[in-house]
Curated annotation (Swiss-Prot):
Residues 180-232, 245-258 have a biased composition (Polar residues). It is an enzyme of class 3 (hydrolase). The lineage of its organism: Eukaryota, Fungi, Dikarya, Ascomycota, Saccharomycotina. GO terms for biological process: axial cellular bud site selection; bipolar cellular bud site selection; cytogamy; establishment of protein localization; maintenance of protein location in cell; positive regulation of Rho protein signal transduction; regulation of establishment of cell polarity; small GTPase-mediated signal transduction. It comes from Saccharomyces cerevisiae (strain ATCC 204508 / S288c) (Baker's yeast). This is Ras-related protein RSR1. The keyword Disulfide bond does not apply.
C-alpha cells in the first residue's frame, strides 16, 4: 500500500476544510473555524490498488505563511481551491501556484484547480468559463467546480490528483530505466580499458615487430615472383619475335647465296 501526501491550498474562507472533511468523513461543516493546520488520513482504492492518503488542510494564504513552504516541500500533490463567490481568492491562487512550482523546481507538479461553493448560484461572481481559461493558462491543469454541501465532485478531485501522482511516478521510472539501458549499451559498444605504461610499451614493440615482419614478407614475396617470371617468359617466347641486328642477318644472306650456287652447278651438270 502506497502512502501519498496531499496538500490543500487556498485563501481563507474558500471551504478547504469543508471539502476535506466531506471527503474523509462524509460530513459537512456548517460553521467556519479558521484552520491553522489539520491532518487527515483516508484509505482509498483506485484502479484496483489501495492507497493511504495523508491530507494536509492548511491555513489561508494570509495566515502562517512561514509554514507554507514546509507544506509544499513535503507534498506530493496539491489541490488549489478558490471560491466562485470571491474573485480575489482566484487571483491569490496565481501567486500560490508560482510558489509551488518554484519550491518543487518543476513544471510537472500534480495539481488540481477547484472552484468551490458552486451551490451558491446567486452569489457567484466567477463563471465556469473563467475557471476553464485559468486551467488552460496553467497547461490544462484539471479543473473542477465542487460543492462540499452537496458533495458534488468531492471524491473526483482527490481521485484525479492521486492518478496524476501515479502517472508521474511511472513516467519518472520509465525515464530512469531508459537512461540506465542507454548507459549499459554504450559501455558494451565502447568498453574503456586502460593499460599500464609497461603494457603499452609492450604493445607498441609488438606492433613494430609485426609491421617490420609484414614488410619483409612482402619484399620476399616480390622477389620470388620476379625469379619465377624469368624462365616463364623465355620458355614461351613467341616464334615471330624480331631478331636482333648483327650476326643473325649475316647468316641469313650466306644461306641464300649457297642455294644459288648449288642450282648453277646442277644446271651445268645436265648440259655436259
Amino acid at each position: 500500500m502506497r502512502d501519498y501526501k496531499l496538500v490543500v491550498l487556498g485563501a481563507g474562507g474558500v471551504g478547504k476544510s469543508c471539502l476535506t472533511v466531506q471527503f474523509v468523513q462524509g460530513v459537512y461543516l456548517d460553521t467556519y473555524d479558521p484552520t491553522i493546520e489539520d491532518s487527515y488520513r483516508k484509505t482509498i482504492e483506485i484502479d484496483n490498488k489501495v492507497f493511504d492518503l495523508e491530507i494536509l488542510d492548511t491555513a489561508g494564504i494570509a495566515q502562517f505563511t512561514a509554514m507554507r513552504e514546509l507544506y509544499i516541500k513535503s507534498g506530493m500533490g496539491f489541490l488549489l481551491v478558490y471560491s466562485v463567490t470571491d474573485r480575489q481568492s482566484l487571483e491569490e491562487l496565481m501567486e500560490l501556484r508560482e510558489q509551488v512550482l518554484r519550491i518543487k523546481d518543476s513544471d510537472r507538479v500534480p495539481m488540481v484547480l477547484i472552484g468551490n461553493k458552486a451551490d451558491l448560484i446567486n452569489e457567484r461572481v466567477i463563471s465556469v468559463e473563467e475557471g476553464i481559461e485559468v486551467s488552460s493558462k496553467w497547461g490544462r491543469v484539471p479543473f473542477y467546480e465542487t460543492s462540499a454541501l452537496l458533495r458534488s465532485n468531492v471524491d473526483e478531485v482527490f481521485v484525479d490528483l492521486v492518478r496524476q501522482i501515479i502517472r508521474n511516478e511511472m513516467e519518472s521510472v520509465a525515464v530512469k530505466d531508459a537512461r540506465n539501458q542507454s548507459q549499459q549499451f554504450s559501455k558494451i559498444e565502447s568498453p574503456s580499458t586502460r593499460l599500464p605504461s609497461s603494457a603499452k610499451q609492450d604493445t607498441k614493440q609488438s606492433n613494430n615487430k609485426q609491421s617490420s615482419k609484414g614488410l619483409y614478407n612482402k619484399s620476399s614475396q616480390g622477389q620470388a615472383k620476379v625469379k619465377q617470371s624469368t624462365p616463364v617468359n623465355e620458355k614461351h617466347k613467341p616464334s615471330h619475335a624480331v631478331p636482333k641486328s648483327g650476326s643473325s642477318n649475316r647468316t641469313g644472306i650466306s644461306a641464300t647465296s649457297q642455294q644459288k650456287k648449288k642450282k648453277k652447278n646442277a644446271s651445268t651438270c645436265t648440259i655436259l
